[in-house]
Design a protein with these regions (language model features):
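HotDog/MaoC-like acyl-thioester-processing domains
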Residues: 2-19, 80-82, 93-145
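Hydrophobic pocket/interface hotspot
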Residues: 31-32, 90, 128
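A broad, structural micro-motif
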Residues: 34, 66-68, 113
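Short intrinsically disordered coil segments
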Residues: 36-38, 88, 133-138
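Hydrophobic residues in beta-strands and at strand termini
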Residues: 21-25, 75, 122
């Protein structure tokens, strides 16, 4: 089961990456809400934003290979087509030598629609095997812990 959102006191202590997006008509299924498969795309977009576009990354080397080893998603309430954007808040809950766990909330100011987590493994693309996270990667991840 996905770890519950941080309590209010602890939430203020953890820096979260914020990625806003607009629900698109094509995301909606025949039941009138966002299709469950689309949430994985929302999480992917948030990870790319965090690892490639985040201001903390300015002046640092690009992240090396990373692969997703596991996703877990708890659907809390339906997300409908709406004029206002929603956001994915992302933070690090666990950091190991060769992997880390990201937690996510897809939310607006009033509701959490999805809670999720992903285990990400550092990966040597050339040798096709897991590798250790380097100092720059650890520093970025620690900023969200």
């Amino acid at each position: 089961m996905v770890q519950p959102a941080l309590d209010t006191d602890r939430r203020e202590e953890v820096r979260r990456h914020i990625h806003e997006f607009q629900v698109r008509f094509g995301d909606i299924d025949v039941l009138g809400h966002v299709n469950n498969c689309r949430y994985l795309t929302y999480l992917e977009d948030a990870r790319v934003s965090m690892f490639r576009l985040d201001p903390l990354r300015q002046g640092t080397a690009p992240l090396k290979g990373l692969v997703v080893a596991r996703h877990e998603i708890d659907y809390k309430r339906p997300l409908l087509l709406r004029p206002d954007p929603v956001r994915v808040e992302t933070w690090v809950t666990e950091l190991r030598a060769a992997s880390f766990t990201l937690a996510y909330e897809i939310r607006d100011d009033e509701h959490v629609y999805v809670g999720a987590s992903s285990v990400i493994v550092a990966y040597d693309l050339e040798n096709t095997r897991a590798r250790r996270l380097d100092e720059d990667e650890i520093a970025l991840l620690e900023a969200y812990r």
